[in-house]
């Protein structure tokens, strides 16, 4: 678990912000399903990355895998299926990993799951500039909160997030919306852009 403050988590301190755009229901459903799935496995997990693919196309292309996942006979038109990717080295920050990824055209979207320590806005001025010192500061601060963040996006530009505090570890307390973690959302969206010479295809 990476232990440093992350920009964009402040909405956990209050009510869910008003959405500037209506969410994509297929993406929202996929993100919430991933959050619930990861949530059942507990805390202190490494970051996880999922490709999102059109369910009907996935069933047609990979019928055996779809059947093993229990979706071959329950296809909802327009829905997205999350397919977990291989884990990368735990010592490599997820932000760096996302900067190297370019998805193939068959992938319609993606989402990433990370755990972070976050602090309330009133202590921002006290956070050291040095990353190592900032991590120690967050880890030892009495007002720290552990939060799981799921950020997803599609090639069409839709985004959706789900956040869960360890202190309120139940599905009813999950906060969701289109842009709750802007920095992470931007990195996820960037993986869906056209490939360039520096990208590594997932």
Regions from the language model: what does each represent?
Residues 79-145:
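Internal, well-folded beta-alpha domain core
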Residues 121-202:
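Glycine-rich, aromatic-bearing surface loops/beta-hairpins
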């Amino acid at each position: 678990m990476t232990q440093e403050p992350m920009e964009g988590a402040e909405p956990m301190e209050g009510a869910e912000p008003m959405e500037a755009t209506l969410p994509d229901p297929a993406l929202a459903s996929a993100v919430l399903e991933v959050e619930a799935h990861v949530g059942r496995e507990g805390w202190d997990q490494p970051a996880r990355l999922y490709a999102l693919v059109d369910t009907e196309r996935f069933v047609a292309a990979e019928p055996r895998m779809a059947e093993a996942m229990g979706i071959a006979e329950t296809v909802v038109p327009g829905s997205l299926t999350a397919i977990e990717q291989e884990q990368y080295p735990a010592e490599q920050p997820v932000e760096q990993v996302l900067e190297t990824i370019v998805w193939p055209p068959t992938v319609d979207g993606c989402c990433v799951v990370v755990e972070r320590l976050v602090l309330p806005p009133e202590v921002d001025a006290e956070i050291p500039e040095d990353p190592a010192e900032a991590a120690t500061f967050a880890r030892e601060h009495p007002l720290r909160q552990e939060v799981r963040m799921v950020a997803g996006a599609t090639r069409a530009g839709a985004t959706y997030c789900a956040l869960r505090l360890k202190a309120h570890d139940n599905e009813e307390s999950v906060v969701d919306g289109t842009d709750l973690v802007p920095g992470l959302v931007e990195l996820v969206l960037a993986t869906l852009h056209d490939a360039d010479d520096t990208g590594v295809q997932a």
